[in-house]
Amino acid sequence: HTAGGVVGGDRLSLNITLQPQAHVLITTAAAGKIYRSNSLQARQVTHLQVAEGACLEWLPQETIVFNQATYRQDLRVDLAPGATWVGWEITRLGRSARGERFLQGEWRSHTEVWQQETPLW
């Protein structure tokens, strides 16, 4: 996440690994902003690995996708036995409080949660 916003062509990658028995809360400083695209796709890939007995609270602020943005986000969570993950991905299409709507563009979101090579979600 960058507080300044994401534009077409940006590639963000985040890999977080919790050690056994760790307890962590991760959030963001502000809402994520995905601005109008220059015809290139912006992409964010997040991979969370939670070791045995660890607990991760993944609670970023919402992502605002502006009109004419082209954006894809992928989230993968890998849980060891006894690991706990609590999380969300909140997406707002346009800034509705300002009367702005998402009328054109593309937004794709993909979330996977795995434990011991078995998909849970």
Tell me the role of every PLM-derived stretch.
Residues 1-121:
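Conserved beta-strand/loop scaffold segments within soluble protein domains that form the structured core
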